[in-house]
Design a protein with these regions (language model features):
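Hydrophobic alpha-helical segments that drive targeting, anchoring, or assembly
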Residues: 133, 197, 464-465
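Short glycine-enriched nucleophile-adjacent loop
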Residues: 203-214
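C-terminal His-loop and adjacent cap/lid subdomain of alpha/beta-hydrolase
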Residues: 1-192, 212-433, 437, 490-494
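Low-complexity, polybasic segments enriched for Lys interleaved with small residues
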Residues: 434-481, 485
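Gly/Ala-rich beta-loop-alpha elbow adjacent to hydrolase catalytic centers
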Residues: 197-203
Length: 494
């Protein structure tokens, strides 16, 4: 008994240590996202009520990756209406649920989010991740006239955040009440199209706001439509709906499909009625994994001719073994390649744009959809490449600082390392070759004669750096903006 107690204590200590390490990684500042966003329409910006340093790794990514008007216009072939709104309250922003809700409501009002065409209440995964493909597809299709609001409840992967779902549901329910209360005070014609989004654990923590209730309750909360990707098997609302869809959704507005092709094949009347989409791949283990498969054969391992597509007919259920193997599948299902969209396992990127258009009633032309799909892939690949390059540069800088310390260089080492590293990188891969191309002017005849006769021609060369000086002074202009949160902030547009 003593040995078991010691073993149990050791395992618990190891788990807690692992949790702390993962949380530290979730709060870490990535080199690619060290600087706060400059758009006043996103959290963490100089005009935001939310400090950038409290957003966590996923929050900093989410706010920094918002599209600009120019990016939207270039893809859609028509001028963007406005800059998109992205609001994120981190787990470290404030410790109390009530304070987080108040803070994000203040941000919604500050940015005039309730005046946008579409307002999205999104529930993140355990780590705080909001699907970038979803967010960008929405911003393209609305021409920027949209807002996405979300609150973090954990910095751990979804598999390690299962004990925090109660907090997440409570937090989401509190924000839902706050948003619907605000919408209730608006005239019907002035309200935005209020929609929901959740992926993986985010789908569970959003749907279970209405646990033991019905789709009609969602309608009473002004919810226009929703998209849920890879809904976990433990989701109470989804389980109740699957068992008795006629009671939970008498109007048939909720559908569960594997891919968008199944939506296209629907009866026209059924497709027209659909507003709430549960997208669950047949080979995604997230909607299948649960303690219920430990001792009981799951429905998806029934007779071979009744199994969903892509579930091997040769696979048999074994007590305990099936549970372990399905758990292993959880890891493999989330293995994705940036820029290469798939439609397998827990990767839903392939169909997201079309589901956004269909569920949220945001029609686009076939040409625009093609351009959106291409842009989504290109952007995801670019962001991934930028992160890799930034991390490599950061590691090189750290190595250089250590070497300089060994040389006895301590004062101003950081600045020296930055300068030296920039010089080395500039020689290897000049980012701005324009000044180098102008160098041949020195070899022109103007160099030989006028250089000696008239010093006036050398003076422009001395003044040339002055053209770059505003760029160096630019941060000084931004400094006052960071001091604004000390007092009441005006609404954007006032």
């Amino acid at each position: 008994a003593i040995s078991l107690a010691i073993l149990g204590g050791g395992l618990l200590a190891a788990y807690e240590y692992a949790v702390r390490r993962v949380e530290q990684g979730g709060a870490a500042v990535e080199p690619a996202y060290e600087s706060p966003p400059q758009s006043q329409f996103v959290s963490g910006s100089p005009g935001s009520l939310i400090p950038f340093e409290t957003l966590s790794r996923e929050g900093r990514r989410f706010t920094n990756m918002a599209l600009t008007r120019d990016e939207i216009s270039n893809v859609m072939g028509t001028p963007a209406t406005c800059d998109p709104i992205r609001l994120f309250v981190g787990l470290d922003t404030t410790p109390e649920v009530e304070d987080r809700v108040d803070l994000i409501m203040d941000e919604l009002i500050r940015t005039r989010a309730f005046e946008r065409e579409v307002l999205v209440f999104a529930s993140p995964t355990g780590s705080g991740y909001i699907n970038y493909v979803f967010a960008e597809a929405l911003e393209y299709m609305t021409l920027g006239d949209c807002a996405i609001a979300t609150m973090q409840y954990s910095m751990l992967p979804s598999s390690m955040s299962l004990t925090r779902t109660g907090l997440a549901i409570e937090q989401n329910r509190a924000l839902m009440h706050a948003i619907t209360g605000y919408l209730r005070g608006m005239a019907a014609q002035d309200r935005p199209k209020f929609v929901l989004f959740g992926e993986s654990l985010g789908a569970l923590t959003m749907q279970d706001i209405w646990r033991h209730r019905t789709v009609e309750a969602m309608d009473r909360d002004f919810v226009h439509s929703s998209i849920f990707l890879g809904t976990p098997s433990a989701t109470e609302f989804a389980k109740a709906w699957r068992l008795d869809p006629g009671r939970i959704d008498p109007d048939g507005t909720m559908l569960e499909v594997d891919n968008f092709g199944e939506v296209v094949d629907l009866d026209p009347a059924q497709r027209a009625a659909a507003r709430h989409y549960l997208i669950s791949h047949y080979d995604d283990p997230i909607p299948k994994f649960g303690t219920n498969i430990l001792l009981r054969r799951p429905w998806w391992l029934g007779p071979g001719d009744e199994r969903p597509a892509r579930v091997p007919k040769s696979t048999t259920w074994r007590p305990g073994t099936t549970f372990v193997l399905t758990g292993v599948d959880l890891i493999n299902a989330m293995d994705v390649v940036p820029g290469r969209f798939g439609r397998r396992g827990h990767d839903y990127r392939e169909d997201i744009a079309r589901f956004v258009s269909a569920a949220y009633d945001l029609p686009v032309t076939a040409e625009q959809m093609l351009r959106i799909e291409r842009a989504l892939r290109a952007r995801e690949l670019k962001w991934a490449q930028d992160r890799v390059v930034s991390e490599q540069v950061a590691r090189a800088k750290e190595a250089l600082l250590r070497e300089m310390k060994n040389w006895g260089v301590s004062s101003g080492a950081g600045g020296s390392a930055d300068s030296l590293l920039s010089s080395l990188l500039g020689e290897a891969m000049p980012a701005e070759p324009a000044p180098v191309k102008k160098a041949p002017v020195k070899t022109s005849p103007a160099k030989k004669a006028p250089a000696k006769k008239s010093p006036a021609k050398t003076s422009p060369a001395k003044k040339a750096p002055a053209k770059e000086s505003p760029a160096k002074k630019a941060p000084a202009k931004k400094a006052p903006a960071k001091k604004k949160p000390a007092g009441p902030l005006p609404l954007i547009g006032e």
